[in-house]
Amino acid sequence: MARTKQTARKSTGGKAPRKQLASKAARKSAPSTGGVKKPHRYKPGTVALREIRRFQKSTELLIRKLPFQRLVREIAQDFKTDLRFQSSAIGALQESVEAYLVSLFEDTNLCAIHAKRVTIQKKDIQLARRLRGERS
């Protein structure tokens, strides 16, 4: 057997295609549903972390103004009817409520981390309030 000279061939850069299994081939040959592309989804937690960073940077109020105002008026009705509020008073209340909630959630998160969890639970909020002396 005589040796022959081998010539260089252009490489495609990939592996040789493998034979498909019968079930895969049947699936691929089945008619597609109009070529509808699935919407892009991020991994669980990615969007949550992005929102956390965004809200930590921002300083604007996160509770909508009108629903908060309705809630304040509804609670005030239990104490005295026909109470009037200045818009600045409602704004000051909303600022303090949001500051309180942010602080409570920070303490709640510390309680969850102490319990070696990353998800806050009702018992974490209860513990945080108890440690603050707000609830006996």
Curated annotation (Swiss-Prot):
InterPro entries, sorted: Histone-fold (IPR009072), Histone_H2A/H2B/H3 (IPR007125), Histone_H3/CENP-A (IPR000164)
Residues recorded as bearing N6,N6-dimethyllysine in the entry: 5, 15, 28, 37, 80
Keyword terms: Acetylation, Chromosome, DNA-binding, Methylation, Nucleosome core, Nucleus, Phosphoprotein
Listed CDD domains: HFD_H3
N6-methyllysine modifications at: 5, 10, 19, 24, 28, 37, 80
Post-translational modification: Phosphorylated to form H3S10ph. H3S10ph promotes subsequent H3K14ac formation and is required for transcriptional activation through TBP recruitment to the promoters. Mono-, di- and trimethylated by the COMPASS complex to form H3K4me1/2/3. H3K4me activates gene expression by regulating transcription elongation and plays a role in telomere length maintenance. H3K4me enrichment correlates with transcription levels, and occurs in a 5' to 3' gradient with H3K4me3 enrichment at the 5'-end of genes, shifting to H3K4me2 and then H3K4me1. Methylated by SET2 to form H3K36me. H3K36me represses gene expression. Methylated by DOT1 to form H3K79me. H3K79me is required for association of SIR proteins with telomeric regions and for telomeric silencing.
GO cellular component: nucleosome; nucleus
One annotated GO molecular function: DNA binding
SMART domains listed in its UniProt record: H3
Compartment(s) where it occurs, according to its Swiss-Prot or TrEMBL record: Nucleus; Chromosome
Pfam families named in the record: Histone
Modified sites of kind N6-acetyllysine: 10, 15, 19, 24, 28, 37, 57, 65
Superkingdom of this protein's organism: Eukaryota
Region of interest (Disordered), residue spans: 1-43
Positions of post-translational Phosphoserine modification: 11
Positions where N6,N6,N6-trimethyllysine occurs in the chain: 5, 28, 37, 80
Subunit structure: The nucleosome is a histone octamer containing two molecules each of H2A, H2B, H3 and H4 assembled in one H3-H4 heterotetramer and two H2A-H2B heterodimers. The octamer wraps approximately 147 bp of DNA.
Function field: Core component of nucleosome. Nucleosomes wrap and compact DNA into chromatin, limiting DNA accessibility to the cellular machineries which require DNA as a template. Histones thereby play a central role in transcription regulation, DNA repair, DNA replication and chromosomal stability. DNA accessibility is regulated via a complex set of post-translational modifications of histones, also called histone code, and nucleosome remodeling.
Family: Belongs to the histone H3 family.
Name used for this protein in its record: Histone H3.1/H3.2
Organism this protein belongs to: Scheffersomyces stipitis (strain ATCC 58785 / CBS 6054 / NBRC 10063 / NRRL Y-11545) (Yeast)
Designated gene of the protein: HHT1
